[in-house]
Each structure stands twice: as structure tokens, then as C-alpha cells.
């Protein structure tokens, strides 16, 4: 295996060809040029692994250097990504060779954890991985969901109109009424980071973000929208500063009855206290013209 499909890191000039392999392996559309350039912002070329068949890249794996919150503290972690093998080269030991190579590198770097989001979790048990958490995708149709009474009480009676009026409902850790402000993520970058950095140390599974990762998250190229709107931001706070935020997208739609039934996708919702969280959720779940709100991860 090692002689037939040698492994090595890629150079920046090889990144385009490298990105084509996971696109084919995951049956995805072609990796757009703007996506390749955006990924370069965070990609760590010295942590890349490519398996070659002659001059062609046939397998890929990579890792990001993270600080990961676990119960009891924060540890260095390798965020495993880009794991793929071309359909034409499956079952030839390429994946196993890349995994062994990568795990040895993670250990040599002194990282305590190797973590990844698995498309097929059963694959990775062979290499020592185990399930650390589960992923929930949630869709709430308008009128079919509600916050628990105790949580809804934190949001206050007026939070449902907070985005329009600039005022929210309840109070919480900040000590004052929660107010909502609608805006664009890039304009609120400082406030978003303040909330996120406050949450990270207290929530296992969270990964600290540096400037590169904020740039990657807030970039809004067309291919990420998937037919929905620009990424929008809803900020919750009081006189003491920001206490929460939601990043989301919308898409107008109409039901068979001719009534509005738009979609709202929550990409990330973070809050430092229950009142701010409840105020954000209440606003997003009661938007006019929205028939269903969905979320997955990072909420």
C-alpha cells in the first residue's frame, strides 16, 4: 500500500485538485472556485495528507488545530476533516493508511483529542474513534412549537416583536431587559466574538475561534446560500453589552393554499444566559410570513 499509493502533504498549488476528491467521494457538486479560495483561509497545508496514484490525488485527509472545551477544562485537539477516497480507489487500504498516519501526527503534536463529524460513524470505530455526542436537526412549523413556560417567561411578553421594535422582553444574567437588534454579521463581528468567547469555556464540545475562523464563518459566498438569503444576524443584549446572537437565512415560499409559508434556517445561535436565548428563539419562531424554522448544530 505505502509504495503503491504514497502519502504526503500537498502544496498550495495542488489545493484545487485536492478539493475535487471529497466532492466526488461525497457525491457533491463541483467545489466552486470561490469555495476553494475561502477554504484556503483556514486550511493548514502542513496537516494535509494526500494519497497519490501516480500524479493523481486519490485520497485526502486533513486536520485543523483547535482548542476544545471538555468537561473540566480546555485541551488541544485535532479537528479531522477532508477525509475521502475516490470511488475508483475504495477498498485498497488507502483510508486505513491515512488514518494511521494522521493519528500518529496528532499524538506527536501533543493533542489530547482527535475529533470529527462523521458521515458514517461505523467507519471510524476501526481506528479508535467513539461517539462523543449526537447531532439533532430540528424543524418547527409555525404554531406547532412553544418554549417551556419557565423559559418563555424569561423572554417576556414583548420579545416576539423585538426585531422590529428594537426592544425585547425579559431580564437575566445581564440584569436588564433583553433588547434585539437586527443587522449583518460583518457589522456585528466584535459583539458576536464577545458572546462566543464567553460561551466557549462553559460548554463542552465548543472550539475556540481565531480571526481566520471568524472570517470563514462570516464570509457569505453564493454557493453557501443554497437558494436562501444572505446570512443575517439577530443580536440580543442590554446596557451592559451583548448577551446572545443568531445567524440565520430566510427564503420566501407559499403554501398550496396561497398563504405565505417561508423558510428560516438558523445556522448558529449562542447566548450567555437563558433570558437572551429565550428572547432569540421566541423572535425567530414567531416571524411573520415564516412557516417553518430549522436548525442543526451550533444551537
Regions found by a protein language model. Give the residues of each.
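A short helix-loop-beta-strand connector motif used in the catalytic cores of GNAT acetyltransferases and
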Residues: 40-59, 79, 134-135, 218-234
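Acetyl-CoA-dependent GNAT
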Residues: 44-47, 52-73, 81, 248-254
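Intrinsically disordered, low-complexity, positively biased terminal segments
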Residues: 1-16, 30, 53, 70, ...
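Ligand-binding pocket scaffold of soluble enzyme catalytic domains
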Residues: 7-30, 41, 46-48, 59-63
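Acyl-donor binding region in acyl/amide transferases
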Residues: 77, 85-113, 117-118, 126, ...
Amino acid at each position: 500500500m505505502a509504495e503503491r499509493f504514497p502519502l504526503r502533504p500537498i502544496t498550495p498549488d495542488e489545493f484545487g485538485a485536492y478539493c475535487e476528491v471529497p466532492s466526488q467521494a461525497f457525491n457533491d457538486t463541483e467545489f466552486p472556485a470561490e469555495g476553494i479560495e475561502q477554504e484556503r483561509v483556514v486550511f493548514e497545508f502542513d496537516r494535509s495528507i494526500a494519497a497519490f496514484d501516480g500524479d493523481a490525488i486519490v485520497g485526502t485527509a486533513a486536520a485543523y488545530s483547535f482548542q476544545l472545551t471538555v468537561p473540566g477544562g480546555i485541551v488541544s485537539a485535532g479537528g479531522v476533516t477532508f477525509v475521502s477516497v475516490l470511488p475508483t480507489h475504495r477498498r485498497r487500504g488507502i483510508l486505513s493508511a491515512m488514518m494511521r498516519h494522521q493519528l500518529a501526527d496528532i499524538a506527536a503534536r501533543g493533542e489530547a483529542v482527535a475529533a470529527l463529524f462523521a458521515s458514517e460513524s461505523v467507519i471510524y470505530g476501526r481506528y479508535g474513534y467513539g461517539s462523543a455526542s449526537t447531532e439533532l436537526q430540528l424543524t418547527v412549523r409555525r404554531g406547532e412549537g412553544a418554549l417551556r413556560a419557565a423559559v418563555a417567561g424569561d423572554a417576556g411578553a414583548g420579545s416576539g416583536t423585538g426585531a422590529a421594535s428594537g426592544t425585547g422582553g425579559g431580564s437575566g444574567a445581564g440584569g436588564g431587559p433583553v433588547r434585539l437588534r437586527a443587522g449583518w454579521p460583518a457589522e456585528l463581528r466584535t459583539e458576536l466574538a464577545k458572546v462566543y468567547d464567553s460561551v466557549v469555556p462553559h460548554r463542552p464540545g465548543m472550539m475556540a475561534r481565531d480571526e481566520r475562523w471568524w472570517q470563514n464563518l462570516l464570509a457569505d459566498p453564493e454557493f453557501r446560500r443554497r437558494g436562501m438569503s444572505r446570512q443575517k444576524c439577530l443580536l440580543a443584549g442590554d446596557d451592559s453589552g451583548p448577551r446572545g446572537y443568531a445567524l440565520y437565512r430566510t427564503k420566501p415560499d407559499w403554501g398550496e393554499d396561497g398563504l405565505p409559508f417561508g423558510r428560516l434556517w438558523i445556522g448558529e445561535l449562542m447566548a450567555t444566559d437563558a433570558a437572551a436565548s429565550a428572547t432569540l428563539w421566541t423572535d425567530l419562531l414567531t416571524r411573520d410570513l415564516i412557516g417553518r424554522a430549522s436548525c442543526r448544530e451550533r444551537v
